[in-house]
Amino acid sequence: MSRPIKWRKICCMPLNKTFAPSGSKPQGKITMTIDEYETIRLMDLENCTQETCAMAMNVARTTVQKIYEEARYKLADALINGKELSIEGGEFRLCDGHNQNCVRAVSYTHLRAHET
């Protein structure tokens, strides 16, 4: 029997969900999950440590490390190889903004679950 899904908490949805090379046809498509996007946002944009990111997402630090490695690989593949990057899916729940571990950027807004 498999383990039940442990939902990853995210604080905000991406404002843009598709990125593609300008001036040339994409050389393929990569899908980054919303929880992978959240680790990039928290660790690279908000300068959170893996530990802080793990607390914000309600997962173990080792889980964050794995998610982050996968996200960075996908991001590099899209940038270097000229692939379209789509951000969608994943195992997540949107936070309500009332959690003490919520890490929101000023430029982002919480979206209610029915708006996603």
Predicted regions and their residues:
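Alpha-helical residues within the helix-turn-helix
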Residues: 55
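Conserved small/polar residues in nucleotide/adenosyl-binding loops
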Residues: 109-116
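Short, Lys/Arg-enriched anionic-surface-contact patches
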Residues: 15-34
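Short helix-to-turn junction characteristic of helix-turn-helix DNA-binding domains
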Residues: 43-46
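Short alpha-helical "packing" element that flanks the helix-turn-helix/winged-helix DNA-binding module
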Residues: 36-40
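C-terminal flanking helix
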Residues: 72-79
